Amino acid sequence: DVMSYGLDTKVETIGRKIAGKIPPLGHQAYNIAVVPVMMQPLRYKVNVELDCVDENGNPYKFHRENMEYALFAICNASYYGGGFCPAPGSKLDDGLLDFTYVDPLSLAKAVPIVPRYSAGTAAEYAPDVVHTGYTVGGRFWSVDDRPLLGNCDGENFDYTEVRFKVEKH
């Protein structure tokens, strides 16, 4: 399960259209969709508040208003889309959601990161722009009261605010 905003949501939207028109492409449609999306500015804005946990289990808050980003993914799985891997160490049963966000970047900086994002090694390759962590809940909300285009498990949504949390059963 992955909820995402930004670049990857746009890739998913275009990839689904390509796959609908050319079904034999299958998941390769998402790899093809990366090209037109990368030709657009890779800069979006959102307000974010996350209840996070560091690697030692200590809680902390991640709060940014008017945050600029290229991609933001909240993950309870390692892979999504056409095999992209934003959270290589994600575990379904650990009570945590992994998150990955990428700062705004130029096309020249983005091009070498994309295959590494697909392989799950982007954070190691570009730690100055690819950031990761763990969360148990939080919210995303619009900076201008317009709906945010997001995606959850292949389904697009557009809300001005989204809240989420991990519930143990």
Predicted regions and their residues:
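Long C-terminal subdomains/extensions of small-metabolite kinases
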Residues: 1-169
